């Protein structure tokens, strides 16, 4: 039985992906479930977070968003039985890679998969669904009538975010990074209030948002990264398409929420003062927090169930690439790790 792992070189950030033979899984006991994996979605690995949590080891398992069939359950398992169809996210410290035929996982990381939902849809939506719920419900309190700016709305995460915001009755503004993205966003139903094309570098996001909201500013911003410095000082890998932090602060309305994915965000005293005057809040989107405390377990499972329900009723319509076989996972994962893919990649077994 082969599984995909990654190895990080000691000198630099470069990581290599390798297939390794695995021993058969031990007997399933206590609260653990043995799962036959039917699909596993690929996401970028945050090596920095793993290092900070002292979770580095020579070979680290790859693939966490899994959907599959329960083969066997431990004696204390109460939620599942053999032949149940389930979906979930393996914890950061999982010893088993999701990119493998079978995995062992604690029952508290899984929920039932609705019959209508395909394996690839389930695995491909569960993590982005969780991130969007975290951003729009728990960090910014989305409600009907609010205005929401979703940066890079044509990305896998952005698409789900727009769909949830529309479902909740919010007014959505989004940015497009290319002509294809712009055309994709303009075809959205219900329609997006305004699509701002930032691909040519001429559009002013802040001006467009203030114009669209009658000068009031938006209630919620979900960014896809921001520039912290002027264009001359910014490192080359930071896309010039990203907005500057001052633009985001300018377009925020009174009492607004800025949910950021920029883990190294730095705010100077004038920035903080401007946020203070608006009574606005900055929140950091880190979906790993749900499993860092057992107190959150019930809420976490409710979110996963709700994501699957939204998928089965057609509220969520994910942007998935064509499913690929396991033997192509190594090459595809290298592309995903460099953040070069637009649609969500799913390995189908």
UniProtKB/Swiss-Prot annotation:
Cellular component aspect of the GO annotation: early endosome
Gene3D superfamilies xref list: Medium-chain alcohol dehydrogenases, catalytic domain (3.90.180.10), NAD(P)-binding Rossmann-like Domain (3.40.50.720)
EC number: 1.-.-.-
Location in or out of the cell: Early endosome
UniProt keyword annotations, A-Z: Endosome, NADP, Oxidoreductase
Main enzyme class: oxidoreductase
Keyword Phosphoprotein annotated: no
Transmembrane region(s): none
UniProt GO molecular function: oxidoreductase activity
Pfam families, sorted: ADH_N
Major place of residence: other
SMART domains named among the record's database cross-references: PKS_ER
InterPro entries membership: ADH-like_N, CRYZL1, GroES-like_sf, NAD(P)-bd_dom_sf, PKS_ER
CDD domains found in the cross-reference section: enoyl_red (cd05195)
Record note on quaternary structure: Component of the FERRY complex composed of five subunits, TBCK, PPP1R21, FERRY3, CRYZL1 and GATD1 with a ratio of 1:2:1:2:4, respectively.
Family per record: Belongs to the zinc-containing alcohol dehydrogenase family. Quinone oxidoreductase subfamily.
Function: Component of the FERRY complex (Five-subunit Endosomal Rab5 and RNA/ribosome intermediary). The FERRY complex directly interacts with mRNAs and RAB5A, and functions as a RAB5A effector involved in the localization and the distribution of specific mRNAs most likely by mediating their endosomal transport. The complex recruits mRNAs and ribosomes to early endosomes through direct mRNA-interaction.
Protein name: Quinone oxidoreductase-like protein 1
GN (gene name): CRYZL1
